[in-house]
Amino acid sequence: MQRNSRRVLIGKVVSDKMDKTITVLVETYKNHPIYKKRVKYSKKYKAHDENQVAQMGDKVEIMETRPLSKTKNFRLVRVIEKATL
């Protein structure tokens, strides 16, 4: 039985103001069933950042984990691309 069937998402850090927590904006695309046009959906996830390495604007990879708080169910896996200021 495989244990690692967890969701892995890629998104952009929109907030790093909380202690050891980042807010990640994940954008997905779906085709509209009637109009056949791609529609962009976005959702924000709170993720645990133990070493506080992610900064605002970074492109990051997050993975689903056990609930760490009321709204935090993801953890930071790695920073894919640093933000250019």
Curated annotation (Swiss-Prot):
Disulphide linkage map: none
Domain of life (superkingdom): Bacteria
Coiled coil (UniProt feature): none
InterPro entries per record: NA-bd_OB-fold, Ribosomal_uS17, Ribosomal_uS17_bact/chlr, Ribosomal_uS17_CS
SUPFAM superfamilies: Nucleic acid-binding proteins
NCBIfam families, per database record: PRK05610.1, uS17_bact
Keywords, alphabetical: Ribonucleoprotein, Ribosomal protein, RNA-binding, rRNA-binding
BP-aspect Gene Ontology terms: translation
Protein name: Small ribosomal subunit protein uS17
Keyword presence, Ribosomal protein: yes
Keyword Secreted attached: no
Subunit structure and binding partners: Part of the 30S ribosomal subunit.
GO molecular function, one term: rRNA binding
Gene Ontology cellular component annotations, sorted alphabetically: cytosolic small ribosomal subunit
Residues that span the membrane, as ranges: none
Known role: One of the primary rRNA binding proteins, it binds specifically to the 5'-end of 16S ribosomal RNA.
Similarity comment: family membership: Belongs to the universal ribosomal protein uS17 family.
